[in-house]
Design a protein with these regions (language model features):
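Extended catalytic cores of very large enzyme megasubunits
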Residues: 1-437
């Protein structure tokens, strides 16, 4: 491969050196069985990805991906890929090193510099660099890069891509143990001894004994310290509540939170709107608005916020809800970022088992069904069926319960949605059911 030129990080060029690649692979596969065979396989497959003018970064990534594509055949390649990726991260953030002792020293030397500089640039909370709160030298001495070996490749790459702090330019400024210590410090501001508390937190995370949620990993210690991971929104059947729910979704997603949004109270399409003497468009277009809001604040290069819209399967627009995640159809009635989930009752499953019909209603006419579960739901649902059959309910549809259940399962198989949520089982076992259904 003498005709291949590699462009180094400083812009200089040098011929591709297969011996350097082999030495790197030998180090990454140290202690593993079939070391020589694995090195030879990766080195041979790497040749297929090379081209003249390849950069050091591209070469590193090609080496890693060559190892990753072999994980399906031998899990030892996962270890090799993780070690190669860690080596790349260390060099990007800390610089060159020759052994584990030097690597640990670099961690200890660079950590206080990283904290102070990031706080100065506004990337971290200024309290992180406050000497009255934290002894940075002591925290740096507690860093243990050997703990990185506990993580699989997926853990290392996920931390790099989603959670590790970066500058606006995209340049990484955290190695994995910097990330763990930053999180530990961000959770220790209000402790009696923040330094000792941070070290204790850190050790549990480094040993994989405790792993905080995604929002905590992204935001702890940062200038936007939103640490909560999960939120619940119930959209009421009025324009103010709908608009507020979209706004709340945007701000929660900005902070990487996950949201469960109940859309079940929104009246069905065609239901009268008295204030404007028109008909409602139903809940589907508003779900599309939430979907667009999620995309607009998706935090490129970081963990994104996520949301799932929930609907009960007696809603008159449930068939349109089932189609939200389909690839074909009107794009204004499809969601690409908003997940969907269906609340399924025991009453429905009994009707599936018994081959009975299932009635769909407009929430505007059966508003209390949303708040009921178990036997109370079944009794009230059956009362509404009698009212419908007596023509005392204006808008309803009747479908075979088994037919709808097949539609749900077909959609789940085709799109992965809607997620099945067993309403009665959850509410009967909920420890905080005093807060509502």
């Amino acid at each position: 491969m003498a005709d291949i030129t590699v462009v180094k990080r400083d812009g200089s060029q040098q011929p591709f050196d297969a011996n350097k690649i082999n030495l790197t692979l030998l180090a990454a596969s140290e202690g593993l069985p079939d070391q020589i065979a694995n090195v030879a396989q990766i080195a041979a497959e790497l040749q297929l990805t090379l081209f003249d003018g390849i950069t050091t970064e591209q070469l590193d990534e090609a080496l890693i991906q060559t190892a990753v594509q072999n994980v399906k055949d031998d899990p030892d390649f996962d270890t090799i890929a993780a070690r190669l990726l860690l080596r790349t991260i260390y060099q990007q953030v800390l610089g060159d090193y020759t052994n584990e002792i030097e690597l640990k020293k670099l961690h200890a030397q660079k950590f206080p510099i990283y904290i102070r500089q990031a706080a100065k640039e506004g990337l971290l909370d200024k309290r992180m660099a406050d000497s009255q709160l934290f002894n940075l030298k002591k925290l740096a001495a507690a860093l243990d890069p050997s703990k990185d070996s506990l993580s699989k490749y997926l853990g290392v790459v996920t931390n790099r891509n989603r959670y590790a702090l970066r500058r606006q330019s995209g340049d990484p400024i955290e190695v994995p143990q910097f990330t763990n210590m930053r999180i530990a410090m961000g959770l220790s501001f209000n402790e009696a001894n923040p330094t000792e508390a941070a070290i204790d937190f850190y050790r549990h995370m480094a040993n994989l004994e405790y792993s905080p949620g995604g929002s905590t990993r992204v935001n702890a210690g940062g200038s936007f310290p939103q640490l909560s991971n999960c939120f619940v929104i119930e959209v009421q059947d009025d324009m103010a509540s709908i608009a507020k729910s979209i706004r709340d979704t945007m701000f929660i997603a900005k902070g990487t939170g996950g949201i469960g949004i109940s859309m079940n109270k929104l009246r069905a399409a065609g239901s009268p709107v008295k204030t404007t003497n028109t008909e409602s468009t139903g809940p589907i277009p508003f779900m599309k608005m939430i979907d667009t809001a999620l995309f607009a604040v998706s935090r490129k290069g970081k963990k994104a916020g996520a949301a799932a819209a929930y609907m009960e399967n007696w809603h008159l627009n449930f068939s349109q809800f089932l189609d939200l995640r389909q690839n074909s159809g009107d794009p204004y009635l499809r969601t690409r970022f908003l997940d969907t989930a269906v609340f399924i009752s025991d009453e429905f499953m009994k009707r599936v088992q018994g081959g009975q019909d299932w009635y769909l209603f407009d929430p505007a006419e059966v508003s209390d069904l949303n708040e009921l579960y178990g036997e109370a739901f079944s009794r009230r649902y059956q009362e509404y069926i009698k009212l419908a059959e007596a023509s005392k309910i204006n808008r309803f549809e009747v479908v075979p319960a088994r037919q709808q259940f097949r539609q749900i399962l077909s959609s789940l198989q085709a799109t992965g949605h809607p997620w099945l949520t067993w309403k009665d089982a959850i509410n009967l076992r909920a420890l905080n059911n005093n807060t509502g259904t």
